Design a protein with these regions (language model features):
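Nucleotide-activated chemistry modules centered on ATP-dependent adenylation/adenylyltransferase
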Residues: 1-235
């Protein structure tokens, strides 16, 4: 392994690797909507929840805000996810733009000398958060709102999140974070897919519990075994 690393150029890493800096919680109420002039950055992962959020924002929210649908490519995605994003873009009638990490998952793990853990999910920061912030910083955005398709029912950590939050971006400015489907049930997620004639990512039919960055090393062991049985090349 050390010989391999000597032969490889180190990945280009940003200087600031810490989690994004927090400022006081947003003073918005849970039911508040973005101001009409704010631009919505709709984070789209290829999963059912972010797709449900995108459908709701595009067709059912009634919001007049400019919307940018953005997929952050971690370099560790299943081909079915790319195919689903093409179908989703057609359904939305809207281009899904892409932000990309500067290095892939394995390069990051080699640089760190370890894999991420439940207590140190640096993969999320380095492969999702910072690339999205860099994408936002490269655009001429007017008071952006980052829309995240997460639900409280997914995990204990997410159950402690708030609908509105704000954070300091790596590009130097604060921006709002909005989680409009935080209180939705999984039944509501699948219902909006059905209303808009959109089949969820086919990975769910193969037993995947989560599909972004696939296979995620944080999924259940049984799900990993199932993924490796279906695709031995993953090993």
């Amino acid at each position: 392994f050390k010989e391999e690393m000597r032969d490889c150029d180190p990945p280009e890493l940003p200087n600031r690797l810490a989690e994004v800096v927090k400022r006081p919680k947003s003073d918005r109420n849970e039911g508040d909507l973005p101001d009409p002039e704010q631009e919505l950055i709709v984070a789209t992962s290829g999963g059912k929840d972010s797709a449900a959020m995108a459908l709701w924002l595009r067709f059912e929210s009634g919001l007049p805000n400019p919307m940018h649908f953005v997929f952050n490519d971690t370099g560790h995605e299943h081909e079915l996810t790319y195919q689903f994003l093409d179908v989703l873009a057609d359904n939305l009638g809207h281009t899904i733009e892409r932000s990309e990490a500067k290095y892939d998952f394995l390069s990051l793990a080699k640089h760190k000398g370890r894999f991420p853990s439940a207590m140190a999910r640096f993969c999320t920061t380095e492969l999702k958060v910072l690339p999205m912030q860099r994408w936002m910083g490269a655009q001429d955005l007017q008071d952006p709102v980052l829309c995240q398709g997460v639900r409280a029912g997914e995990s204990k950590r997410r159950s402690q999140m708030t609908v509105w939050d704000d954070t300091l971006g790596d590009f130097g400015g604060f921006y709002d974070i909005w989680r409009p489907i935080l209180r939705w049930s999984v039944e509501e997620v699948f219902a909006i897919h059905k209303r808009h004639n959109l089949e969820p990512n086919d990975l769910y039919k193969m037993g995947a519990g989560r599909v972004g960055c696939w296979p995620c090393i944080h999924v259940r062991k049984g799900e990993l075994r199932n993924a490796f049985r279906r695709d031995p090349g993953l090993l």
